[in-house]
């Protein structure tokens, strides 16, 4: 997961790279990137010339959860709790040439080997898949 904070001219002000456990989903990676981006930009709000931040994300599922259109996970709840006045969120389609999004995608790949380690709860979907796979394995051995 990764985020980039840019000024109005498109210059990088801050960035963050985060290595997530292998069991994490893309949804969790998007939520971590948004949470960490909000935490970072909260520190910048109120500095001279900094009135607001626009958080652009290609994570439509996380954005929908934040707006209440989907069930909000505890991780997305953390994003919502961290948001202060001066933040707005916008969806940008991924892999469509948006410079900031392309940069973040490249940083996210980099983060898989060199990012700051982040621990997250194991998602229910992952444990269900492990149980299902194990059940199939045992069944195939028996029959």
Question: Can you say where each PLM-predicted feature lies in the sequence?
Answer:
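RNase H-like nuclease fold core
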Residues: 1-47, 51, 66-67
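C-terminal functional segments of enzyme domains
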Residues: 44, 48-143
């Amino acid at each position: 997961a990764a985020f980039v904070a840019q000024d109005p001219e498109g210059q990088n002000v801050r960035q963050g790279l985060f290595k997530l456990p292998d069991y994490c989903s893309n949804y969790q990676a998007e939520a971590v990137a948004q949470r960490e981006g909000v935490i970072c930009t909260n520190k910048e709000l109120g500095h001279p010339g900094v009135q607001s931040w626009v958080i652009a994300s290609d994570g439509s599922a996380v954005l929908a959860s934040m707006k209440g259109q989907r069930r909000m996970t505890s991780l997305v709840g953390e994003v919502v709790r961290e948001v202060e006045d001066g933040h707005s969120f916008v969806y940008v389609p991924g892999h469509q040439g948006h410079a900031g999004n392309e940069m973040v995608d490249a940083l996210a790949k980099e983060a898989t080997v060199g990012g700051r380690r982040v621990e997250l709860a194991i998602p229910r979907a992952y444990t269900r898949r492990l149980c299902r796979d194990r059940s199939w394995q045992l069944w195939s051995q028996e029959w």
